[in-house]
């Protein structure tokens, strides 16, 4: 299919990256194609986290494959954190010099009673602002406090500025899922090639 038929400019080179991260606690493999079709294959050993990362890939239009083996006998913290770090690194590497991208993206996404607003700047500088309602501590084996840490870890390696505000929500599943969907839509907007030559910064680099 001609990429221009969907309103997307064809990338000059494939925007993709593969990252392997090995520690004494985890083994992580991430393959990311920015200009994909939303095809996802996620296996971290944490079912709810798999579901969240699938939302991220699908709604961003990324092809995303993640395989993580971690010390789940301890808890899910290392698995979740290291996966997010590797994903952020893959995102940064896939974008390269960021020439021709829109750079900024935003989204307002509902999920039943939950509502999330996200704004992103692919600035090259990691910064996170995050707010969400209080909720139950566990969804299955997933600690809901980990979601903020996902974004902290992703932002640290992706080198982006990310604002996330959950404006409404009662159901913990919805409060978490709507964040991943909204971030996905904002990233999809920010990585789009807009036909303007060069890097979108007066500094000449991002």
UniProtKB/Swiss-Prot annotation:
GO process terms (BP):
L-histidine biosynthetic process
> What UniProt keywords apply to this chain's record, in alphabetical order?
Amino-acid biosynthesis, Cytoplasm, Histidine biosynthesis, Lyase
* Subcellular location per the Swiss-Prot or TrEMBL entry: Cytoplasm
The cysteines covalently paired via disulfide bonds are none
The UniProt catalytic activity note for this protein reads: D-erythro-1-(imidazol-4-yl)glycerol 3-phosphate = 3-(imidazol-4-yl)-2-oxopropyl phosphate + H2O
Tell me which GO cellular component terms the UniProt record holds: cytoplasm
Family membership, please give it.
Belongs to the imidazoleglycerol-phosphate dehydratase family.
Per its record, how is this protein called by name? Imidazoleglycerol-phosphate dehydratase
Question: Which organism's genome codes for this protein?
Answer: Acidothermus cellulolyticus (strain ATCC 43068 / DSM 8971 / 11B)
**Gene coding for it:** hisB
């Amino acid at each position: 299919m001609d990429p221009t038929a969907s309103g997307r400019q064809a990338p000059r080179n494939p925007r993709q990256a593969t990252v392997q991260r090995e520690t004494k606690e985890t083994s992580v493999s991430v393959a990311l194609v920015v200009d994909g079709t939303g095809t996802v294959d996620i296996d971290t050993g944490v079912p709810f986290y798999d579901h969240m990362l699938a939302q991220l890939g699908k709604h961003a239009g990324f092809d995303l494959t993640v395989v993580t083996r971690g010390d789940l006998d301890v808890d899910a913290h290392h698995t979740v954190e290291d996966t997010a770090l590797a994903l952020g690194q893959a995102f940064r590497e896939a974008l390269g010099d960021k020439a021709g991208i829109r750079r900024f993206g935003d989204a307002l996404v509902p999920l039943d009673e939950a509502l999330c607003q996200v704004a992103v700047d692919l600035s090259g500088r990691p910064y996170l602002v995050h707010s969400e309602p209080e909720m139950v501590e566990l969804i299955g084996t997933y600690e809901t406090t980990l979601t903020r840490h996902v974004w902290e870890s992703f932002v640290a390696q992706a080198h982006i500025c990310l604002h996330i505000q959950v404006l409404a929500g009662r159901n913990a599943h919805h409060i978490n899922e709507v964040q991943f969907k909204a971030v996905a839509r904002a990233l999809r907007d920010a990585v789009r090639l807009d036909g303007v030559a060069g890097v979108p910064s007066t500094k000449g680099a991002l």
